[in-house]
């Protein structure tokens, strides 16, 4: 099979659309945030990866800043500029998760401040939506572990999560498509802000924030597919 890779303008436009959406939400501060989209290719078993090259931000990028890489290796298949170090993590996720076709990585202010305060070790669940949207528990990577330069540890956790929090660093969300990865990012960062607001209000009023129980959360994960992609209008959270 031919290994020739041609640029698909539709995939490029989709990447650019979500770069604009992510930037509009204030997630982008520098060159290190990124989006990766997998596209099928007959010459590459894992497909190929569309992404932004290094040296500029998602906010600044245009179609000419899209490069295409191999997935098992960092080889550039289209374009002539290098990707940033974070692309290593996204490539490894795509290699290990054939069900995933998009990743989104940002350095979110609220997340970095929330964990940087030293007061919290996890994002707790207040709302009904986060577990449904994420579909699986959040995985937390300790601040001293660099899974971008050394991806060997990714295989140990990536099957059991759709959202990776790199403590002191950023968030990477996974999706069957870029829309799903984007919704997961927004749900996770919203829940962090809700945690902060609930804790501050509870402190001011002398009350306790009302977080969901583990049993409730596990039930939401179990029915996530039925809620987000319903096949019927009623009795959605009933076992078939």
Show where each model-derived region lies.
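Glycine-rich flexible loops
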Residues: 1-240
């Amino acid at each position: 099979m031919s290994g020739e890779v041609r640029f698909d303008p539709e995939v490029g436009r989709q990447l650019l659309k979500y770069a604009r959406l992510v930037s509009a939400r204030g997630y982008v501060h520098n060159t290190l945030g990124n989006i990766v989209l997998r596209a099928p290719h007959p010459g590459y078993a894992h497909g190929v990866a569309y992404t932004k090259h290094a040296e500029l931000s998602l906010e600044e990028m245009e179609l000419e800043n899209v490069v295409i890489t191999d997935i098992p290796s960092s080889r550039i298949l289209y374009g002539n500029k290098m990707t940033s170090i974070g692309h290593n993590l996204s490539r490894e996720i795509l290699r290990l998760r054939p069900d995933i076709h998009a990743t989104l990585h940002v350095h979110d202010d609220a997340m970095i401040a929330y964990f940087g305060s030293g007061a919290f070790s996890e994002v707790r669940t207040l709302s009904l939506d986060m577990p449904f949207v994420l579909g699986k528990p959040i995985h937390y990577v300790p601040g001293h572990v660099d899974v971008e330069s050394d991806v060997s540890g990714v295989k140990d956790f990536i099957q059991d999560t759709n959202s990776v929090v790199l403590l002191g660093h950023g968030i990477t969300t996974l999706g069957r498509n870029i829309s799903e990865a984007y919704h997961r990012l927004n749900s996770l960062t919203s829940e962090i802000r809700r945690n902060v607001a609930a804790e501050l209000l509870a402190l001011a009023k002398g009350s306790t924030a009302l977080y969901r129980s583990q049993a409730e959360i596990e039930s939401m994960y179990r029915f996530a597919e039925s809620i987000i992609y319903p096949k019927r209008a009623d009795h959605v959270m009933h076992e078939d």
